[in-house]
């Protein structure tokens, strides 16, 4: 048996495997892809942290709080031992004139295929992380990912140099004009795509208020179904909870709309392992603080009664 959250995710995986089309991609890994899909999660029924594999709430929550703070430097993440953005910052460093270590060309693919190189890569990455944490000048130069999510959410800059806090504006709109159809935040800033370590995959989200409940719909242009989507589901569900609390509302639905929904060819075995599992009951979320969303800390958030199958490892496509 599957709970409703895991079932929706499993059905998407099965549909992509069954009818998806093979496509090449930016990373040259290869994918099975489907264009256009939608999932709906009733957040009053629990918190959609998948149970058919262990998903780290700490990584999800600290990344979301990083976005909310408007931060774009991995130093904050590393302080929580959150490594999910490391490869993009590391890539910038090893391509710079300041790097004089072993050849790191195509380190992502090489580390998967060559164990001796993988050991060298891990050592270089560990040294890089230590420098980010302990050297402010180095962190400022090589820890910053450019104008990624946090910058666009909190400090969108137009062509005239005006700065716009989208997230704060939307929260104020929800409080003062809940029936507006303009509760939208966009991370897709066409004029700044080239300044980002990775163009935003989850590009735009909209809030909807009905009967005292706040719902959120995310449009995700590019969706890594195995590694990324379980995080995205939980992240935007958490964001909905935080903003609902900020605005004195209950939670409604999280609606997840996909553009290119894909399974990487080197994730298929991992997906099949997950699909063979039964689920547990979903956990619940506690927000143990009345602080503003902009002042919430990770320690204020609590996942209750989370039971899951073991994590399943798979390589990230850089």
From Swiss-Prot:
GO terms for molecular function: thymidylate synthase activity. Its main location: cytoplasm. Its EC number is 2.1.1.45. The keyword Coiled coil does not apply. DUMP binds at residues 26, 181-182, 221-224, 232, 262-264. It is found in: Cytoplasm. PROSITE patterns: THYMIDYLATE_SYNTHASE. GO terms for biological process: dTMP biosynthetic process; dTTP biosynthetic process; methylation. The keyword Transmembrane helix does not apply. Keywords: Cytoplasm, Methyltransferase, Nucleotide biosynthesis, Transferase. GO terms for cellular component: cytosol. Pathway: Pyrimidine metabolism; dTTP biosynthesis. InterPro entries: Thymidate_synth/dCMP_Mease, Thymidate_synth/dCMP_Mease_dom, Thymidate_synth/dCMP_Mease_sf, Thymidylate_synthase, Thymidylate_synthase_AS. It catalyses: dUMP + (6R)-5,10-methylene-5,6,7,8-tetrahydrofolate = 7,8-dihydrofolate + dTMP. The active site is at 201 (nucleophile). Pfam families: Thymidylat_synt (PF00303). (6R)-5,10-methylene-5,6,7,8-tetrahydrofolate binds at residues 224, 317. Homodimer. PANTHER family: THYMIDYLATE SYNTHASE, THYMIDYLATE SYNTHASE 1. Catalyzes the reductive methylation of 2'-deoxyuridine-5'-monophosphate (dUMP) to 2'-deoxythymidine-5'-monophosphate (dTMP) while utilizing 5,10-methylenetetrahydrofolate (mTHF) as the methyl donor and reductant in the reaction, yielding dihydrofolate (DHF) as a by-product. This enzymatic reaction provides an intracellular de novo source of dTMP, an essential precursor for DNA biosynthesis. Belongs to the thymidylate synthase family. Bacterial-type ThyA subfamily. This is Thymidylate synthase. It comes from Staphylococcus saprophyticus subsp. saprophyticus (strain ATCC 15305 / DSM 20229 / NCIMB 8711 / NCTC 7292 / S-41). The lineage of its organism: Bacteria, Bacillati, Bacillota, Bacilli, Bacillales.
